[in-house]
Design a protein with these regions (language model features):
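Peri-transmembrane interface segments
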Residues: 142, 155-172
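Mid-to-C-terminal secondary-structure elements
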Residues: 22, 26-42, 51-155
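Exposed loop/turn and edge beta-strand positions of beta-sandwich/beta-sheet ligand-binding modules
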Residues: 15, 50, 103, 162-164
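Short amphipathic alpha-helical segments
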Residues: 17, 121-125, 164
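Residue-level detector of beta-strand face positions
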Residues: 9, 73-77, 167
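Short linear capping/connector segments at secondary-structure termini
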Residues: 3-7, 47, 126, 162-165, ...
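Short amphipathic beta-strand/extended segments in non-transmembrane regions
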Residues: 1-42, 168
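Short, well-ordered secondary-structure micro-motifs
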Residues: 11-13, 96-98, 172
Length: 172
């Protein structure tokens, strides 16, 4: 699961850098093919308690800790909110569109929703089908689940039905 990202300023002492914080759960690492190189991913308990902990990408580490090699255990601030670093992601470099995949911060989705976005609902979900062939089936199942959760009426012979109030994007 991933929540909506929020961009802002990350601060460590006199060092600061603009970046994006993503509210996620542990499955996000698998879905996005990310690995924790140092430290660890935050726990289920961190999610349940909306803990102010995070896992950071190498670009964020380089910008906030230019003279230190191990930021695990250190506290950084997102705008004014402190987050303790529990892990550092293995570097992925730039993607084919020229975006720095190491310029990110991951935190428990519950903490981002509560402490940053001040919302009580999930804005975004990331999923991964086991194989490319299962993508359509997964999309259909996700659509069915979301329509049910959002209490949207299906079309019948004499009723048009409710439009989806969500979007599903597919990346292969």
């Amino acid at each position: 699961m991933s929540g909506a990202p929020s961009s802002g300023q990350f601060i460590n002492g006199n060092n600061n850098t603009p970046s994006t914080i993503y509210g996620v759960n542990q499955d996000y690492l698998t879905i996005r093919k990310l690995d924790v190189e140092d430290g660890e991913m935050f726990s289920d308990e961190d999610i349940k308690s909306s803990a102010k902990v995070c896992v950071v990408g190498k670009t964020v580490v380089d910008n906030l800790f230019p003279d230190e090699s191990d930021p695990v255990g250190k506290v950084i601030r997102f705008n004014t909110i402190p987050f303790r670093i529990v892990g550092v992601l293995k570097s992925k470099g730039y993607n084919s569109m020229g975006m720095d995949q190491d310029d990110l911060v991951l935190a428990p989705y519950s903490a981002v929703m509560k402490r940053i976005l001040a919302i009580t609902y999930v804005q975004s979900i990331s999923c991964s089908a086991l194989t490319e062939d299962l993508t359509d089936k997964a999309t259909e199942e996700i659509t069915s689940i979301l329509r049910s959760q959002h209490k949207l009426k299906d079309a019948t012979d004499d009723f048009e039905g409710d439009e989806d109030d969500f979007n599903i994007g597919v990346v292969v």
